[in-house]
């Protein structure tokens, strides 16, 4: 028994379910080797049902990626329906379905899912930490008459767009370029 419980998942839906259980003081159940819940309640170090004081979501970048993958699969199904309605066959159908990608409305859905994650953590009453990889902030500029994406020189969390705006504190950790063993941080 311990006072830390680690759950491995790449599913945003599962993460939101665990946050909901923590918020509502519900029991957690041990996971078997196949990833299925058992009937065995997870216990803390005192033998009581486990109730987290803090939640760590390590990998919003991965959750964002898997969310996008799921929506792309849905987009292919959406394209399949459109191809059926249009009566497409052969290469035309193949291009329509296999070429399906994220549409503008899909990006908005993904961003809402990311905000749901942060807002669920805010409402949980638990301490929380959310990690993300970082990426260069980019802006659109017209260069030689063409619209191009240009780095601003700032680093931002890679993952759900705008998730940092609902967090109380953002810490950017980085290695000192002159001393790789030293980790520094911006708050």
Question: Positions of the model-derived regions?
Answer:
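Conserved inter-motif catalytic segment of the P-loop NTP-binding fold
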Residues: 1-112
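Phosphate-binding/switch region of NTP-binding enzymes
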Residues: 112, 119-187
């Amino acid at each position: 028994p311990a006072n830390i419980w680690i759950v491995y998942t790449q599913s945003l839906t599962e993460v939101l379910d665990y946050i909901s259980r923590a918020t509502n003081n519900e029991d957690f159940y041990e996971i078997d080797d196949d990833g299925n819940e058992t009937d065995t309640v997870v216990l803390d170090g005192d033998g009581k049902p486990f109730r987290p004081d803090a939640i760590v979501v390590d990998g919003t970048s991965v959750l964002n990626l898997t969310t996008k993958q799921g929506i792309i699969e849905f987009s292919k199904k959406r394209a399949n329906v459109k191809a059926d309605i249009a009566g497409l066959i052969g290469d035309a159908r193949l291009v329509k379905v296999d070429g399906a990608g994220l549409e503008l409305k899909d990006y908005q859905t993904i961003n809402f899912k990311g905000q749901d994650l942060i807002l669920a953590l805010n409402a949980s009453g638990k301490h929380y930490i959310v990690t993300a990889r970082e990426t260069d902030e980019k802006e659109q500029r017209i260069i030689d008459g063409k619209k191009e994406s240009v780095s601003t020189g700032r680093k931002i969390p890679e993952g759900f767009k705008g998730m940092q705006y609902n967090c109380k504190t953002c810490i950017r950790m980085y290695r000192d370029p002159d001393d790789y063993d030293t980790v520094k941080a911006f708050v």
